Amino acid sequence: MNIFPAIDLINGKCVRLEKGDFNKTTTYELEPKDVAKAYQQAGAEFIHVVDLDGAKKGQTCQFETIQKIRENCNMTLQVGGGVKDFETIEKLLEIGVDRVVIGSLAVKDIALTKKFFEKYGAEKIVLALDVFIKNGVPYIATHGWQESSTTTLDEILQTYLGDGLEYVLCTDISRDGMLQGPNFELYRIYSSIYPDVQFMASGGVGSLEDLEILKEQNTYGVIIGKALYENKFTLQEALEC
């Protein structure tokens, strides 16, 4: 299983939100580029960066910070937050981003998102599908989790399978930033229904036991954020799982 340490950015600083709530923000006095370098030195091969300002505004804006992260590490770098157009994707790829994460746009503008797959290839595109569970069904939440939709996770996955959909980062927003364990059932079920899709688990990881369960379920990858900042375990320990 691939470990993706996460860096969430607001105004150039590392932060964590609780349940995606911009009013419940913890800011860490750490330089993002230094955090990235430390992750690489610990042995990480992947890193996940989110421009939360971009997610909220609907336009990626922290290019300079992202570029500094790129210059300080050679890990596979995936970046999301407000990616809405070709220009933004071009700029991110230009500064060395390996995979671009498409969030609410994948629900709001399917035609444009399909064009991204066509132009850049499925290996460059990660769909970030944030879900809330209602009556046992995962529905999509959009726009930095500030809106909820009536679209189900299944509907979106089916929409993009024909485009070669390869990577899906799926977050149960009720778990995010809570350190109370991810939604194991969600990843287990969807990994078995869609064996050709590489699912990245996100939200709620708070212990090494959580990682071991996800690994046993053959989850492709897991995003780890707050657990590292709060020293629940070290990145080395996570990588050794």
From Swiss-Prot:
Give any Pfam family that matches: His_biosynth
Q: Which InterPro entries does the annotation name?
A: Aldolase_TIM (IPR013785), His_biosynth (IPR006062), HisA_bact_arch (IPR006063), Isoase_HisA-like (IPR044524), Isoase_HisA-like_bact (IPR023016), RibuloseP-bd_barrel (IPR011060)
Q: Where in the cell is it found?
A: Cytoplasm
UniProt keyword annotations, A-Z: Amino-acid biosynthesis, Cytoplasm, Histidine biosynthesis, Isomerase
Q: Name one GO molecular function term.
A: 1-(5-phosphoribosyl)-5-[(5-phosphoribosylamino)methylideneamino]imidazole-4-carboxamide isomerase activity
The positions flagged as active site in the entry are D8 (proton acceptor), D130 (proton donor)
Q: What class of enzyme is it?
A: isomerase
Reactions the enzyme catalyzes: 1-(5-phospho-beta-D-ribosyl)-5-[(5-phospho-beta-D-ribosylamino)methylideneamino]imidazole-4-carboxamide = 5-[(5-phospho-1-deoxy-D-ribulos-1-ylimino)methylamino]-1-(5-phospho-beta-D-ribosyl)imidazole-4-carboxamide
Under the heading Gene3D superfamilies, the entry gives: Aldolase class I
Q: Which GO terms describe its biological process?
A: L-histidine biosynthetic process; L-tryptophan biosynthetic process
Pathway involvement of the protein, from the record: Amino-acid biosynthesis; L-histidine biosynthesis; L-histidine from 5-phospho-alpha-D-ribose 1-diphosphate: step 4/9
EC number(s) per entry: 5.3.1.16
User: May I have one GO cellular component term?
Assistant: cytoplasm
User: PANTHER family of this UniProt entry?
Assistant: 1-(5-PHOSPHORIBOSYL)-5-[(5-PHOSPHORIBOSYLAMINO)METHYLIDENEAMINO] IMIDAZOLE-4-CARBOXAMIDE ISOMERASE
- Family membership noted in the UniProt record: Belongs to the HisA/HisF family.
Name the chain's protein.
1-(5-phosphoribosyl)-5-[(5-phosphoribosylamino)methylideneamino] imidazole-4-carboxamide isomerase
Task: State the species of origin.
Answer: Francisella philomiragia subsp. philomiragia (strain ATCC 25017 / CCUG 19701 / FSC 153 / O#319-036)
Q: What is the lineage of its organism?
A: Bacteria, Pseudomonadati, Pseudomonadota, Gammaproteobacteria, Thiotrichales
Gene that encodes it = hisA
